[in-house]
Every structure is written in structure tokens, then in C-alpha cells.
């Protein structure tokens, strides 16, 4: 059943143009999705996995607020909201054993091997670490998807969910820009999706230059980069043009 929108009626779809780098991009919000990547305590809260693994999460609060703003605007415009949660079962079977590169490269798994007292606490489904931050709450009509790897397209129904709804444009927010956000956007690019990142609604894992490098990669090779204020302006009723 189509999602309602205050910006369109039965006369046809509505298009808007988002100012972005390297150039503006035009899309129909009702055939687009806002994707919120891994806004879990693990990635955005002191005491979560990233913090315990030695990454700086002290500047994530503005990102949370900006995501709230973007979600509100997207929902009002009739965009599908998709929330990802990264993690595994309590026994970490889904994480893969020594035969998986994920076993060797996941900083969560490596941190637990170094600190056995954390075993079962990091990114385990049902744990505080796995939960979305308190400020971000999915609403009826949103879709919440678990994912076992960095990319939201790997071993998830994301592609079929999007294709069944005719969605081709994806707007990304979340953490970490240089890991799960970029991985999902890149995989989407290879599957013919148009990906946009809202830079002030994302946060990197690592130094500030990592954020800049990820955004450079995205705007140069794989997608587009904009910001929350510009995104919200593009979704205001005065910004829409009707398509036949």
C-alpha cells in the first residue's frame, strides 16, 4: 500500500531537486528511502563497543540530533525509513569463525578476545550495545533490519524490499561513515541505486581525516553528498514539481 505524503495527491508523483556535491540530484521522495545505519549504543554512546575499542564517540550527539531532524522530514514527505542494526546472535555464530575474514577484522570481536569479560556484551542481539540509541525510535511503517556485516546489502532482504517498492534513490545517515555507511552505499551503487550521504548526519570511526576521505570517495566515485538542512529544504512542499 503506498505511503501517504502531504506533498503529492492522486494526480501523479512529485519530484524534488536536492543540492549536493558534485551536482544536484532529482528524486521522487515516495520512491526513495532514508537509511539510518547502525545508530546503536555500540557506535554512538560512551561505554559502547566503539568507545571500548578506543574510538572517539564524544562528538556523536549532534549527529543523533541531525538524524532525528532528517527522519522527521523524510517521514512527512512519504519516504520509507529503514533502520539497520549491526550485530550477531549471542553465540556469535553469525559473526563467522576463523575461516571468515570478519573474525579477524571486526574490532568488536578482537576487543572481546583481548578482554574476555566483554564476551557476549558487544553487538550481541538483545544487549544494550545492540540497541538503538534512546533518541531514535522507529515508528509504525518503518523497517528495521539486522545485518551481520558492514554492508546492509549482505545477507539481508534490503535489495528485494527496495525493488518491490520501486525505490531507486537512497539517502544515508548513521555511523560509521567510512565503514558501514560507505560499504552499503558502494554496494548499492553496484546494484544501480543512487546514493546520497547527509554529511552532518554521519560520523566516522577514526580521525577526522577519515570522514573527509570517505566523503571524497563517495562524491567523486559512488554517489552524492549533501547535508540535513538542504535535505529538509528539498522536502518542503514549495520545493516539489509534479510529474505526469
UniProtKB/Swiss-Prot annotation:
Keywords: Hydrolase. Transmembrane segments: none annotated. InterPro entries: Isochorismatase-like_dom (IPR000868), Isochorismatase-like_hydrls (IPR050272), Isochorismatase-like_sf (IPR036380), RutB (IPR019916). It catalyses: (Z)-3-ureidoacrylate + H2O + H(+) = (Z)-3-aminoacrylate + NH4(+) + CO2; (Z)-3-ureidoacrylate + H2O = (Z)-3-aminoacrylate + carbamate + H(+); (Z)-2-methylureidoacrylate + H2O + H(+) = (Z)-2-methylaminoacrylate + NH4(+) + CO2. It is an enzyme of class 3 (hydrolase). It holds the Pfam family Isochorismatase. Induction: Up-regulated by the nitrogen regulatory protein C (NtrC also called GlnG) and repressed by RutR. Gene3D superfamilies: Isochorismatase-like. GO terms for biological process: nitrogen utilization; uracil catabolic process. The keyword Cytoplasm does not apply. The active site is at 38 (proton acceptor), 147, 180 (nucleophile). One of its GO terms (molecular function) is hydrolase activity, acting on carbon-nitrogen (but not peptide) bonds, in linear amides. Its EC number is 3.5.1.110. Hydrolyzes ureidoacrylate to form aminoacrylate and carbamate. The carbamate hydrolyzes spontaneously, thereby releasing one of the nitrogen atoms of the pyrimidine ring as ammonia and one of its carbon atoms as CO2. Belongs to the isochorismatase family. RutB subfamily. This is Ureidoacrylate amidohydrolase RutB. It comes from Escherichia coli O55:H7 (strain CB9615 / EPEC).
Amino acid at each position: 500500500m503506498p505511503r501517504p505524503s502531504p506533498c503529492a495527491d492522486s494526480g501523479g508523483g512529485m519530484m524534488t531537486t536536492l543540492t549536493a556535491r558534485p551536482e544536484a540530484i532529482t528524486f521522487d521522495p515516495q520512491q526513495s528511502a532514508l537509511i539510518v545505519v547502525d545508530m546503536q549504543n555500540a557506535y554512538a554512546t560512551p561505554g559502547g563497543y566503539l568507545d571500548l575499542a578506543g574510538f572517539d564517540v564524544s562528538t556523536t550527539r549532534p549527529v543523533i540530533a541531525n538524524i532525528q531532524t532528517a527522519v522527521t522530514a523524510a517521514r512527512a514527505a512519504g519516504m520509507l525509513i529503514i533502520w539497520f542494526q549491526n550485530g550477531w546472535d549471542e553465540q556469535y555464530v553469525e559473526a563467522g569463525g576463523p575461516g571468515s575474514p570478519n573474525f579477524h577484522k571486526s574490532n568488536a570481536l578482537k576487543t572481546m578476545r583481548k578482554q574476555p569479560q566483554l564476551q557476549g556484551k558487544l553487538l550481541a542481539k538483545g544487549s544494550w550495545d545492540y540497541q538503538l540509541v534512546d533518541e531514535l525510535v522507529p515508528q509504525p511503517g518503518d523497517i528495521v533490519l539486522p545485518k551481520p556485516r558492514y554492508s546492509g546489502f549482505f545477507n539481508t532482504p534490503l535489495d528485494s524490499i527496495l525493488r518491490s517498492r520501486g525505490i531507486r534513490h537512497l539517502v544515508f545517515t548513521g555511523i560509521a561513515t567510512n565503514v558501514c555507511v560507505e560499504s552499503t552505499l558502494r554496494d548499492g551503487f553496484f546494484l544501480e541505486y543512487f546514493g546520497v550521504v547527509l554529511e552532518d548526519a554521519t560520523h566516522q570511526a577514526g580521525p577526522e581525516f577519515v570522514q573527509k576521505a570517505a566523503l571524497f570517495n563517495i562524491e567523486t566515485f559512488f554517489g552524492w553528498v549533501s547535508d540535513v538542512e538542504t535535505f529538509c529544504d528539498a522536502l518542503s512542499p514549495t520545493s516539489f514539481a509534479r510529474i505526469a
